[in-house]
Amino acid sequence: MTSVLFVCLGNICRSVAAEAVFTQCVAARNLQADFRADSAGLIDYHEGELADNRMRRAAAERGLTLTHRSRPVTSADFSRFDLIVAMDEANVRGLESRRPQGNATPIVRLADYLTAHASPTIPDPYYGTEADFHHVLDLLFDACPNLLDELLEK
Protein backbone atom coordinates (compact mmCIF):
# COMPACT_ATOMS: atom_id res chain seq x y z
CA MET A 1 0.00 0.00 0.00
CA THR A 2 1.29 3.44 -0.94
CA SER A 3 0.82 6.12 1.71
CA VAL A 4 0.67 9.83 0.92
CA LEU A 5 0.74 12.74 3.37
CA PHE A 6 -0.53 16.15 2.21
CA VAL A 7 0.89 19.12 4.12
CA CYS A 8 0.08 22.82 4.36
CA LEU A 9 0.55 25.40 7.08
CA GLY A 10 -2.39 24.78 9.43
CA ASN A 11 -4.10 21.66 8.03
CA ILE A 12 -7.48 23.39 7.85
CA CYS A 13 -7.70 24.43 4.18
CA ARG A 14 -5.42 23.11 1.45
CA SER A 15 -3.97 19.86 2.77
CA VAL A 16 -7.24 18.57 4.22
CA ALA A 17 -8.98 19.30 0.91
CA ALA A 18 -6.13 17.69 -1.06
CA GLU A 19 -6.44 14.58 1.09
CA ALA A 20 -10.17 14.42 0.30
CA VAL A 21 -9.73 15.02 -3.44
CA PHE A 22 -6.95 12.43 -3.67
CA THR A 23 -9.06 9.92 -1.70
CA GLN A 24 -11.97 10.56 -4.07
CA CYS A 25 -9.67 9.93 -7.07
CA VAL A 26 -8.48 6.68 -5.48
CA ALA A 27 -12.06 5.56 -4.82
CA ALA A 28 -13.17 6.45 -8.35
CA ARG A 29 -10.58 3.99 -9.65
CA ASN A 30 -11.43 1.38 -6.99
CA LEU A 31 -7.88 1.53 -5.59
CA GLN A 32 -8.69 1.89 -1.88
CA ALA A 33 -6.68 -1.24 -1.06
CA ASP A 34 -3.61 0.27 -2.73
CA PHE A 35 -3.48 3.83 -1.37
CA ARG A 36 -3.80 5.59 1.97
CA ALA A 37 -3.90 9.37 2.36
CA ASP A 38 -3.69 11.67 5.36
CA SER A 39 -2.94 15.34 5.94
CA ALA A 40 -1.13 17.47 8.49
CA GLY A 41 0.04 21.00 9.13
CA LEU A 42 3.36 22.60 9.92
CA ILE A 43 1.87 24.45 12.89
CA ASP A 44 -0.26 23.09 15.71
CA TYR A 45 -2.37 26.24 16.18
CA HIS A 46 -5.51 24.53 14.82
CA GLU A 47 -4.82 21.07 16.25
CA GLY A 48 -8.04 19.09 16.69
CA GLU A 49 -10.16 21.52 14.66
CA LEU A 50 -12.22 20.64 11.61
CA ALA A 51 -11.38 22.25 8.29
CA ASP A 52 -12.16 25.93 7.87
CA ASN A 53 -15.93 26.44 7.37
CA ARG A 54 -15.36 28.15 4.03
CA MET A 55 -13.36 25.19 2.72
CA ARG A 56 -15.95 22.74 4.01
CA ARG A 57 -18.72 24.65 2.20
CA ALA A 58 -16.76 24.89 -1.05
CA ALA A 59 -15.82 21.21 -0.84
CA ALA A 60 -19.42 20.18 -0.14
CA GLU A 61 -20.47 21.91 -3.36
CA ARG A 62 -18.12 19.47 -5.13
CA GLY A 63 -19.38 16.39 -3.31
CA LEU A 64 -16.62 16.24 -0.69
CA THR A 65 -17.16 15.91 3.04
CA LEU A 66 -14.20 17.13 5.08
CA THR A 67 -14.20 15.32 8.43
CA HIS A 68 -10.45 15.33 9.12
CA ARG A 69 -9.29 17.13 12.26
CA SER A 70 -6.14 19.20 12.05
CA ARG A 71 -2.92 17.73 13.35
CA PRO A 72 0.70 18.79 13.18
CA VAL A 73 3.38 16.97 11.20
CA THR A 74 5.41 14.65 13.42
CA SER A 75 8.87 13.20 12.95
CA ALA A 76 7.21 9.77 12.72
CA ASP A 77 5.32 10.91 9.60
CA PHE A 78 8.57 10.86 7.65
CA SER A 79 8.82 7.09 8.13
CA ARG A 80 5.07 6.34 8.10
CA PHE A 81 4.48 7.77 4.61
CA ASP A 82 5.96 6.88 1.23
CA LEU A 83 5.46 10.39 -0.15
CA ILE A 84 4.93 13.81 1.40
CA VAL A 85 3.13 16.39 -0.74
CA ALA A 86 3.54 20.10 0.06
CA MET A 87 1.29 22.92 -1.09
CA ASP A 88 4.01 25.57 -1.53
CA GLU A 89 7.73 26.27 -1.19
CA ALA A 90 7.40 27.46 2.40
CA ASN A 91 5.85 24.09 3.23
CA VAL A 92 8.74 22.29 1.52
CA ARG A 93 11.25 24.31 3.55
CA GLY A 94 9.32 23.66 6.77
CA LEU A 95 9.23 19.95 6.05
CA GLU A 96 12.92 19.82 5.19
CA SER A 97 13.75 21.52 8.49
CA ARG A 98 11.76 18.85 10.36
CA ARG A 99 13.08 15.89 8.40
CA PRO A 100 14.82 13.39 10.70
CA GLN A 101 18.49 12.86 9.91
CA GLY A 102 18.97 10.08 7.39
CA ASN A 103 15.34 10.09 6.20
CA ALA A 104 14.88 10.02 2.43
CA THR A 105 11.09 10.17 2.07
CA PRO A 106 10.39 12.21 -1.07
CA ILE A 107 8.84 15.65 -0.60
CA VAL A 108 7.12 17.02 -3.70
CA ARG A 109 5.06 20.11 -4.54
CA LEU A 110 1.48 19.37 -5.57
CA ALA A 111 1.54 22.28 -8.03
CA ASP A 112 4.09 20.34 -10.08
CA TYR A 113 1.22 18.01 -11.06
CA LEU A 114 -1.01 20.74 -12.50
CA THR A 115 -1.78 20.40 -16.19
CA ALA A 116 -4.87 22.57 -16.77
CA HIS A 117 -3.71 25.49 -14.59
CA ALA A 118 -0.49 27.46 -14.49
CA SER A 119 0.29 28.10 -10.83
CA PRO A 120 3.62 27.71 -9.03
CA THR A 121 1.83 26.81 -5.79
CA ILE A 122 -1.47 25.77 -4.30
CA PRO A 123 -2.12 29.20 -2.74
CA ASP A 124 -3.40 29.55 0.81
CA PRO A 125 -7.01 30.82 0.66
CA TYR A 126 -7.28 31.48 4.40
CA TYR A 127 -7.21 35.29 4.15
CA GLY A 128 -9.00 35.34 0.82
CA THR A 129 -12.52 35.28 -0.53
CA GLU A 130 -14.93 32.43 -1.17
CA ALA A 131 -13.70 32.44 -4.76
CA ASP A 132 -10.18 31.69 -3.52
CA PHE A 133 -11.39 28.50 -1.83
CA HIS A 134 -13.06 27.41 -5.07
CA HIS A 135 -9.86 28.21 -6.99
CA VAL A 136 -7.86 25.99 -4.63
CA LEU A 137 -10.32 23.17 -5.25
CA ASP A 138 -9.97 23.70 -9.01
CA LEU A 139 -6.22 23.27 -8.61
CA LEU A 140 -6.61 20.18 -6.41
CA PHE A 141 -9.01 18.53 -8.85
CA ASP A 142 -6.45 19.21 -11.58
CA ALA A 143 -3.33 18.01 -9.73
CA CYS A 144 -4.50 15.03 -7.65
CA PRO A 145 -5.47 12.74 -10.56
CA ASN A 146 -2.07 13.42 -12.14
CA LEU A 147 -0.30 12.63 -8.89
CA LEU A 148 -2.22 9.37 -8.68
CA ASP A 149 -1.31 8.56 -12.29
CA GLU A 150 2.37 9.04 -11.52
CA LEU A 151 2.16 6.84 -8.44
CA LEU A 152 0.46 4.11 -10.47
CA GLU A 153 3.31 4.19 -13.00
CA LYS A 154 5.87 3.38 -10.30
Could you describe each region identified by the protein language model?
Residues 6, 85-86:
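Hydrophobic beta-strand core positions in alpha/beta domains
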Residues 15, 88-89:
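Helix N-cap/beta->alpha junction signal
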Residues 1-80, 149-154:
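Conserved active-site segments centered on acidic
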Residues 83, 89-154:
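Phosphate-binding/catalytic loops
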